[in-house]
Amino acid sequence: MTPEFMTPGRLAARTSRALEAAVAAGRGLGLTVTDPAVLHDVFSVVVHLAPSPVVVRVPTVLPTYAGLDTRAAQQRTELAVVSWLAEQSIPVIPPSPLVPQEPVQRDGFSMTFWQFVEQDTTVEPDYVHNSRLVADLHAALRAYPGDLPFLSTAEPRFTTEGLAALAYRPDLVDPADLDRARREWEILEPVVRSRAAFEAAFPGIDLQPLHGDAPAVNIVAATNGALYADFELATLGPVEWDLAALGPACEAAYNSAAQLRGLRQLDARVLRFINAVGRCRTVACLALAPQLPLLVEALKPSIEQWRGMPFDAGPAG
């Protein structure tokens, strides 16, 4: 059955359910919550449990296979990575010290609890500057002692299943675009799924713990300085993944900072590969549009740009 687009009423109801679950979970953990407020509502509903200095992130837009256990496992990894970084005095938004550092499940949602920080609303995002800070983060993450899955952030199952589902949605994607994305993904997927295949395709490219989700974009300008945030997709992979789709200026800024840190420069061939994976994932994201209708317009510029580009990023390229 083809999923229908969620109406504004259903979207609002989903937000309300997530808000109510976050408040109930917070109160269940002993927090005082009298004036909760939704701070963000896109892929997750982010709730400030005011007056408690706690923010809850409740993922709401998810692949069909991402059950509670899958979500909780991913969230435990995030909490472990961020807790370790905080212990090393790396500037992050840390888990809340007022509750156990574990995902909480309530009313069908799996959520995490974070320390509330005041944001400096006068600061404009500067992704070139932030890309320099990503090199600092990578230098710190190299010492992370925990185990991380290889390129789990690429979510190959999501891309494979998303592209398959779009075969029945010509209203969401042009069939010619979908055909191209599936052909490109057929080449890229084996290297994304297998560390051994990646290392064979890109010999000499070291792997390390990564943020996993555009860290230059996920740096929060707090009143006490810049803070790394949103490690939901923490993974093991090449550093190029964290610079995907940011462009030459950000890449140059990262390389400059990496050189000062004694880290390797970005590899152009790996970047082409990573960006090609990202473009296939962008097309696959249209499969989530029934859950999040704004994706149709939000993804259109990226897909139009991809349509005019050659595919030159195969592992053997």
Task: Pin down the residues of each PLM region.
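ATP/Mg2+ or Mg2+-diphosphate-binding catalytic cores
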Residues: 2-12, 17, 60, 161-172, ...
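Catalytic-loop signature of eukaryotic-like protein kinases
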Residues: 213, 217-219
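Active-site Asp-x-Gly
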Residues: 209, 220-272
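ATP-binding glycine-rich phosphate-binding loop
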Residues: 28-50
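A cross-family kinase active-site recognition segment
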Residues: 121-183, 207, 317
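Protein kinase catalytic-loop region centered on the HRD/HxD motif
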Residues: 200-208
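Conserved short submotifs of the Hanks-type protein kinase catalytic core
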Residues: 108-119
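A conserved alpha-helical element in kinase catalytic cores
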Residues: 12-22, 58-107, 124-132, 136
